[in-house]
Amino acid sequence: MNKDQSKIPQATAKRLPLYYRFLKNLHASGKQRVSSAELSDAVKVDSATIRRDFSYFGALGKKGYGYNVDYLLSFFRKTLDQDEMTDVILIGVGNLGTAFLHYNFTKNNNTKISMAFDINESKIGTEVGGVPVYNLDDLEQHVKDESVAILTVPAVAAQSITDRLVALGIKGILNFTPARLNVPEHIRIHHIDLAVELQSLVYFLKHYSVLEEIE
């Protein structure tokens, strides 16, 4: 994303990969153009929001015609740096970490886990999903140019490991632990607590109907 585009709202930026994934599917099916209404129905984002999101990037479509799928796909590929590979490291090869290694973002052409770390001796020196697993004690020896890390470790260990990652130059952390991490302001962390998300879903099912939320 270029310097000017980095000024777009964070909520818009988070939706761009969603648009890109749908456009890839449209392109694969041979569809040549799409309306904001069709996009809205597919990605479950209202049409007005989609048009506003796209407006931050200039004129991407034509009134009465919609959007050219090939053009949008090419535009968002460049915007999201899809032609540039990003190597990601993973800390914690437990059940969740192992699942990530086997999946390894196979649908994303520009992102892959290149190495993993753990303290379990039975896993150190092995490969999981084709990804080498190293001793966490040797973290500083292996991490060089990587800037993104996935954290799937016990909460009690999360902060100390995060401190080491920051010292190594990691700029972004996808945190799957319950811990809320303290980092410098220039570090970006996305917290994903699966237990909290599940509890929230159950609560909303019990206390709110979908129609109430729409209203």
From Swiss-Prot:
The gene is rex. It is found in: Cytoplasm. GO terms for biological process: negative regulation of DNA-templated transcription; response to redox state. This is Redox-sensing transcriptional repressor Rex. NAD(+) binds at residues 92-97. GO terms for cellular component: cytoplasm. The keyword Transcription applies. Modulates transcription in response to changes in cellular NADH/NAD(+) redox state. Homodimer. Residues 18-57 bind DNA. HAMAP family: Rex (MF_01131). InterPro entries: CoA-bd, NAD(P)-bd_dom_sf, Rex_DNA-bd_C_dom, Tscrpt_rep_Rex, WH-like_DNA-bd_sf, WH_DNA-bd_sf. Keywords: Cytoplasm, DNA-binding, NAD, Repressor, Transcription, Transcription regulation.
